[in-house]
Each structure stands twice: as C-alpha cells, then as structure tokens.
C-alpha cells in the first residue's frame, strides 16, 4: 500500500504525536508498505519526507498556501490513502484532509488528543461551514475515552474507530535474569519509588502531581520510606522547583528529560507509576511503565483505562482523592504491588503492540477506500 501521512508536527520535534507518527512510519515500512510524510515542521532532509515550510515566527507548523502544496504532492505520488494526524486543532493537517478529498484519495484522520467542550464547538462550527461530515472520512481515536467526544460531534454516519498508539512492548519488558528484571523484583533498600514521566506543561497538571505526592506522603505511615522521580521538562518546571523548595520536599527529584534507555533504567527501579492528568487521550508513558512491569495509577476517565484494569495492571480513580488513596494503598501494600508487577511482567498489552496497530489501520484504510 502507498501511504501518505500528513502531520503538522514531525521529527526533529520530539512530542508525543511526532514520535508516534515516526514510529508508525517505520513499522509500516518494515511491513513492506511504501510510506511518505508531508509536514509543516522545518528540519533536515529525510528520505520520503516532504517539508512544506513557511518562514513564520516561532517555526509555527502551518503554511498559508499549504493546500496548494499538498494538492501538488498528492497528484504526483500515486498514493492509495492519505493518513492525517491531528491534535486538538491542527490547521495544516486539516488542509491535508481537504486536499486529499479534492484529490479523490481515501482519507483516514487520527485524532491524537482529547476533544474538550471548546474543541467540540470548533468542529461543530466547521461542520456548519464546510460540511466535513459528508467528506467520506474515517476517523480514528487513540482510546475509547478519546473516541467518545469525537463520536458526539461526528454523528452516526462518520466511522470513528479506536486504534491504539503503538509500542514495541517486548523492548520495555525486563528479560528474566537481567539487571532490570532483578531490580524490579527486589525492592532494594525498601524505599517505595514513585515515578512519573511527561512534559511539564499546565495541561498535564504537574503542580497537582506534586500536591498528590505530598498528600500521599502525609497519609503513608512514617515507617514506609518514599521517594519520587518526575522525568520531563517544560514551562512548569520553575514553578515545580519553587513548590518543592517551599514545601521542603527534597525526596522528590526533577532530573529533566531522559532518553528512552534512561527511562527504561528508571522504570526498572520503580514501584509505582503515576499518570494523574484527567484529559490524557492515551498515556504512552503509562503504557511504557505497564510494559516494564510497574503498577500504574491513573484516571479512570483517561485513555490509560484502555490498558489498565483496577487491581490487574494498576489502580484507577476518578478524583484527586481517589488517586491519592491509590498511591497510599500501593505504598503500604507490598503484596499488592508485587502481584500487579508480576502480572504486568508476564502479560503483554496486545492491543498496543505494533502488529495489532498495523492491522487496525489496515482495516481503516480498507473502510476509507470502500
């Protein structure tokens, strides 16, 4: 199959969408498909990547004449399907949808974000203005939680499929007998190590995470030692550092951004992984932790609930207090931590493996072409 991916953002940017699209491109090429990418992100020349870049402030990933460029690329490539990737509102990606419809290409559009009420209002207004529901699109969401608000806007005539984000799950699982496997199996000094990984941006509620950790520490018996590591960088880091200083929370560290290998090593010594954001469309970092054998604490209304069941892969809660109680329970109950960790190490989140993801998108491509 000749596939053209369209995404506002792509490598060398390293956000969640950019990395996921790049991994999907790699997996599809390894499966024998011919895959190219069109993006509005500036960067080095890469094989099969078309960069439609305008000289705009802050390297904004948009182009005022993007549709014309996209039409030219689509006309020259003999593609079988256009696969468009959008966040909440992605102007260049939706130019790609419009260009593909005009070119007569089947279109699959993956929504990587959770549509909030404002975003839903925007898409209802766009439907009133342009009638996009009648364009023959197949929409996909990365989780059931993300699909629900999309279905509410798209209506019954627009297919909204759920295709998980992909992960090479075997690469995150500690091998039996390895240092990583031993580190997970043995608690070491007995300190309960709580880990979180993600961009330190307001949408992820990082200050709320610090309050959660502080409250949990207050409720855990004093004879249970705790420490926490929050990996990532972003605009909220300064406020987080001030919070930790003022509250004298020296047991929480902010080491900055980590590579994948560094995150794997960190998870090898983690006892609990926390993903507290309520509007998490998927939660790739939580999936990595689950694949690495770490019990996950997350919101029941987030995309993490697609691969974490209460008491099986971790604990879920709907409120802040629920999450605090879950962290406290896991910190106090080493037997529960151990049983969840063993389950996570011995089973795979099959729906999130690349073979399952490729099969899901192949079905969507067939649906769009029919």
For the regions a language model picked out, list residue spans one by one.
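Conserved donor-binding/catalytic core segment of Leloir-type glycosyltransferases
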Residues: 4, 183-214
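Carbohydrate-associated surface elements
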Residues: 145, 166
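Nucleotide-activated donor-binding/catalytic signature segment of Leloir-type glycosyltransferases, i.e.
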Residues: 241-258
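Short alpha-helical donor nucleotide-sugar binding micro-motif in glycosyltransferases
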Residues: 257-258, 265-270
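Aromatic "clamp/platform" in nucleotide-sugar-dependent glycosyltransferases that forms part
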Residues: 278
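Short hydrophobic beta-strand element within catalytic cores of glycosyltransferases
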Residues: 295-298
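Conserved acidic donor-binding segment of nucleotide-sugar-dependent glycosyltransferases
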Residues: 310-321, 329-334
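A short, well-ordered alpha-helix in the C-terminal region of glycosyltransferases
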Residues: 336-351
